[in-house]
Swiss-Prot record:
It is found in: Cytoplasm. This is Cytidylate kinase. PANTHER family: CYTIDYLATE KINASE, CYTIDYLATE KINASE/PANTOATE-BETA-ALANINE LIGASE. Belongs to the cytidylate kinase family. Type 1 subfamily. The gene is cmk. Keywords: ATP-binding, Cytoplasm, Kinase, Nucleotide-binding, Transferase. The lineage of its organism: Bacteria, Bacillati, Bacillota, Bacilli, Bacillales.
Amino acid sequence: MDKRISIAIDGPAAAGKSTVAKVVAKELSYVYIDTGAMYRTLTYAALEQKVDIENEEQLMEVVKNVNIEFQQGENTQLVFLNGQDVSEVIRTPDVTNRVSIVAKHRLVREEMVRRQQELAKKGGVVMDGRDIGTHVLPDAEVKIFMLASVEERAERRHLENLNKGFDSNLEQLKEEIAQRDKLDSEREVSPLKKADDALELDTTSLSIEEVVQKIMSIVSGVFAK
């Protein structure tokens, strides 16, 4: 397995992309790039600066002054904003419910995509997001599009919130996830959609281990070529 390929994992909110991508990266000793965390970090920075997140010009001022870095912690990947560890705070419902608004702006996405491509240019990466296979890494050797029902995704996010000590309402989460799906798939710039050459993987009734196993067997097939 000397060949160092790029693996793109796309899908809607709470489909389990990050969880699976981290495990796949670990198995292959690849770098994991969480593009969602990049948009979350930008959203957090904008909220902290009391910026109007509907205003692209104001957001671009924030982008210019934002340095986002990833570091591998003991059991998880840490996210830093201008040297400050924001790994936990970018997962709060406040940020979660606004990240799709920040991500819909054309200039913001163009700059973030440029940064993501820069991080991935040497290969040996697993990257997850909404537009990785279609836009960020269109030449990725492996492209996966992960799906799960709104109910299943709301359940997962609900458990995640409770485990982190956040208040959580399952019915409200279903509405919020459906709304994020709408925003992500209808936005003008790089909407959420399956790349023509991506393999679709419905994870509704699958465990993390089963999903990882399926992806690893796809990767093995690429290495065997």
